[in-house]
């Protein structure tokens, strides 16, 4: 049996794409092995959000060839879509696929085997208008949570972001296809589904009848054995009243939202071409917290955007302190050629970016601890993801790490709960 190994850089959408490609190989009688092992085929799913993502992608390509010089090396994902010629020029790369056409990956490998010539299968993503169905079969992972992509592409064109150029226009998945995959995942033991997409909050705007993310959630709530529905990243301006009502009234819709802030300064938000003001963002947070009990809010913040002054950044720090995020994904601004921000004057020095990220990370940890401690004395429940050192471990509904003493009677994917009695090493202790 031929072996195939996968590695993934970047976001949850990329992880879904990897799992889906893995499923296609498994359906065709390949065996999946760890990327550090010798394999017949290596698949590297790349990222282009930052320069570091591209650097890591190149390193992984070379690592694969060192592990087995006779292996086929397949490079896919955003970096492959953005610069296929650069990928193809790397010694040892056999197949380049972008962010579309991946449903044919096994066929392309078979074509490789018959021709022994490099294949560049990257297509113009801007000409693609339909969602590429590449569903999970349920045997790609042994985890309790499954990521499920329901939307692709983005029309926002923020000044710093390369993703619209690598993922293309908005493309949404039909609700019936989403439900069919969700049922299959539940049948395979996945009791939490994380809905993901590049521009998740804009789900359905281009489909007939304009179905919404709330419509998707309502359809999924009809699946009895689906214990939890969680969302990936959603733009704050796209959180609808209908979605808020679902979160407020059905406990299976997790009280956790990832709402990218990107900057806590209106000056910087304008430069970024974001579609909200700081005041609008704060008002939404207040509204959400008034409606959704125990809501935890996580976010993304870019440090050191061009022209971000010390005063701008101090305003961001004050905003973070005021809102109290449960977690902040803080990262330094990275120049992406072809985006408006790349040519803006007054680029911030790397050392300043690093310092600002460190300050944000400190506030992130403080915010996590504050929220976690607020749970002490209240009910807590985890979906078991692993058993380790005598404890069942997993995430609570609110996206906080939790652990319960093992009794030997539960399995991965089960819900188990009690009362939160403490916090230890970033884990809630539940008894």
Write out the residue ranges for each language-model feature.
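Short flexible coil/turn linkers enriched for glycine and charged/polar residues
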Residues: 141-144, 154-156, 253, 263, ...
């Amino acid at each position: 049996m031929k072996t195939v190994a996968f590695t993934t850089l970047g976001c949850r959408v990329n992880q879904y794409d990897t799992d889906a490609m893995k499923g296609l190989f498994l359906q065709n009688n390949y065996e999946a092995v760890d990327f550090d092992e010798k394999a017949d085929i290596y698949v590297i799913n790349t990222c282009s959000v930052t320069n570091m993502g591209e650097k890591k992608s190149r390193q992984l390509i070379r690592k694969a060839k060192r592990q087995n010089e006779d292996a086929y090396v397949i490079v896919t994902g955003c970096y492959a879509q953005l610069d296929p010629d650069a990928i193809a020029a790397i010694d040892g790369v056999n197949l380049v696929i972008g962010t579309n056409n991946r449903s044919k990956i096994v066929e392309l490998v078979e074509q490789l085997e018959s021709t022994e010539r490099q294949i560049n299968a990257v297509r113009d993503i801007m000409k693609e208008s339909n969602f590429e169905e590449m569903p999970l079969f349920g045997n790609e992972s042994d985890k309790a949570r499954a990521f499920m992509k329901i939307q692709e592409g983005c029309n926002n064109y923020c000044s710093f972001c390369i993703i619209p150029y690598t993922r293309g226009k908005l493309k949404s998945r039909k609700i019936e296809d989403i439900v069919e995959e969700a049922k299959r995942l539940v049948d395979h033991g996945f009791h939490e589904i994380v809905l993901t997409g590049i521009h998740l909050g804009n789900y359905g705007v281009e489909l007939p009848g304009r179905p919404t993310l709330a419509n998707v959630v309502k359809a999924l709530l009809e699946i009895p054995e689906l214990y939890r529905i969680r969302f990936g990243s959603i733009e704050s301006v796209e959180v609808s009243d209908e979605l808020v009502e679902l979160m407020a009234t059905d406990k299976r819709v997790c009280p956790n939202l990832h709402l990218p802030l990107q900057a806590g300064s209106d000056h910087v938000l304008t430069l970024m071409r974001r579609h909200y003001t700081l005041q609008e963002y704060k008002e939404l947070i207040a509204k959400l917290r008034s409606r959704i009990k125990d809501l935890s809010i996580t976010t993304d913040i870019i440090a050191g955007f061009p022209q971000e002054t010390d005063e701008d950044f101090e305003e961001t720090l004050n905003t973070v302190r005021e809102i109290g995020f449960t977690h902040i994904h803080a990262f330094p601004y990275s120049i992406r050629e072809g985006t408006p921000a790349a040519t803006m004057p007054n680029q911030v020095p790397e050392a300043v970016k690093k310092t600002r990220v460190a300050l944000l990370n400190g506030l992130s940890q403080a915010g996590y601890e504050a929220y976690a401690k607020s749970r002490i004395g209240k009910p807590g429940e985890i979906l078991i993801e692993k058993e380790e050192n005598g404890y069942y471990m997993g995430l609570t509904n609110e996206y906080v790490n939790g652990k319960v003493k093992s009794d030997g009677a539960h399995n991965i994917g089960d819900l188990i709960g009690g009362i939160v009695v403490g916090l230890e090493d970033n884990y809630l202790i539940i008894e």
